[in-house]
Amino acid sequence: MSNRKYFGTDGIRGRVGDAPITPDFVLKLGWAAGKVLARHGSRKIIIGKDTRISGYMLESALEAGLAAAGLSALFTGPMPTPAVAYLTRTFRAEAGIVISASHNPFYDNGIKFFSIDGTKLPDAVEEAIEAEMEKEISCVDSAELGKASRIVDAAGRYIEFCKATFPNELSLSELKIVVDCANGATYHIAPNVLRELGANVIAIGCEPNGVNINAEVGATDVRALQARVLAEKADLGIAFDGDGDRVIMVDHEGNKVDGDQIMYIIAREGLRQGQLRGGAVGTLMSNMGLELALKQLGIPFARAKVGDRYVLEKMQEKGWRIGAENSGHVILLDKTTTGDGIVAGLQVLAAMARNHMSLHDLCSGMKMFPQILVNVRYTAGSGDPLEHESVKAVTAEVEAALGNRGRVLLRKSGTEPLIRVMVEGEDEAQVTEFAHRIADAVKAV
């Protein structure tokens, strides 16, 4: 891993007004990116955003920086992250830029780049942009300055793309669906996609005001969706996060259906249709029930580190076409280049329509194991608790007791002095007791 100063695993992110998410930094970032990308030939960059109020300020700053470097900006307006990846490909733009902090609150924002083919920018290009940031900002000759324009049909183009991933011979006319768009970037996309495919749609979380993105709605908080599905006696609910790269579903009984279950349904349907190539990639946090259910179907399963970037890397390494995180990032490389909540949701709906089965019944082949997560704070600088003999001994005892019907995962938080203790097994009471036993051992260090 390179020692980049600004770019993390998912672009540049932070609180608006605090470095680096400030207008002056973002202007210079636009200029530096423009200088680097202009070397590659194309003169246009796609810029999309979610519905945060700060998006207006940041897209203006980016556009000014790009123009100073001689590149033109094409604005999409509020648009899901995967839509920007798609439009970057179809417009043959040199790059796409998304202004979003995904599932974070409105006061955060971030900048993420896509390359010309709709995938993440290569590390070398990000490093070149950072190197350019160290230079004094300059301006091309007036005649060479970049321009700005809007892609007026951006939403329509992406809606048609999404619909094209749903089989022509199927219809959603039998389904009543509640869709929750998190007051985010899918608010004008997802309801229209579902309606045009025939569904009876009830939309919530579709009234963005700049500050209500992800606020008690969307994929990170499905309580409002669960309540509405039950109240409307709907067949199911679908929730997206603020930038539309995650999807979580709710069955007609109000049960949450997470990314693990969604991947199970899509992988099993792919197998039935003879379209599954290779296996499926999850993460260290993927439920053991997923692994066992896929094993019963004869589908290979591999675990990547937590993070959709690492899931994609493992998929590419294996040559597999499907991967997911339990948080709802689902990557289907036969359809898209990045996690796409709408496209993933449509594949589940296709399985429902083709098999005339409810979402609840499609999930029935996979038994979710209870997963207990305990966060333990430790004193930074006092050594690594995970290396302590007492912690290792208790962990070994628990692993021996669980055998091959459970798992223990201990990992450090990347952002604060926390040890995350996760224990998974068939018996919830036993798993809870084991998790707290390990947590107590960590605290005692």
From Swiss-Prot:
Pfam families: PGM_PMM_I, PGM_PMM_II, PGM_PMM_III, PGM_PMM_IV
Gene Ontology MF terms in the entry: identical protein binding; magnesium ion binding; phosphoglucosamine mutase activity; phosphomannomutase activity
Gene Ontology CC, one term: cytosol
Keyword ATP-binding part of the UniProt annotation: no
SUPFAM superfamilies reported in the protein's UniProt record: Phosphoglucomutase, C-terminal domain, Phosphoglucomutase, first 3 domains
Keyword terms, alphabetized: Isomerase, Magnesium, Metal-binding, Phosphoprotein
Active site, renumbered: S102 (phosphoserine intermediate)
Requisite cofactors: Mg(2+)
GO terms (BP aspect): carbohydrate metabolic process; peptidoglycan biosynthetic process; UDP-N-acetylglucosamine biosynthetic process
CDD domains attached to this UniProt entry: GlmM
Catalysis: reaction(s): alpha-D-glucosamine 1-phosphate = D-glucosamine 6-phosphate
PTM remark: Activated by phosphorylation. Can autophosphorylate in vitro using ATP, alpha-D-glucosamine 1,6-bisphosphate or alpha-D-glucose 1,6-bisphosphate.
Summary of activators and inhibitors of this protein: Autophosphorylation is inhibited by inorganic phosphate or EDTA.
Main enzyme class: isomerase
Gene3D superfamilies assigned to the protein according to its UniProt record, in alphabetical order: Alpha-D-Glucose-1,6-Bisphosphate, subunit A, domain 3 (3.40.120.10), Alpha-D-phosphohexomutase, C-terminal domain (3.30.310.50)
Modified residues (Phosphoserine): S102
Family to which this protein belongs: Belongs to the phosphohexose mutase family.
Function comment: Catalyzes the conversion of glucosamine-6-phosphate to glucosamine-1-phosphate. Can also catalyze the formation of glucose-6-P from glucose-1-P, although at a 1400-fold lower rate.
PANTHER family: PHOSPHOGLUCOMUTASE (ALPHA-D-GLUCOSE-1,6-BISPHOSPHATE-DEPENDENT) (PTHR42946:SF1), PHOSPHOHEXOSE MUTASE (PTHR42946)
More about this protein: Catalysis proceeds by a classical ping-pong bi-bi reaction mechanism, with alpha-D-glucosamine 1,6-bisphosphate as an intermediate.
Name under which the protein is recorded: Phosphoglucosamine mutase
Organism: Escherichia coli (strain K12)
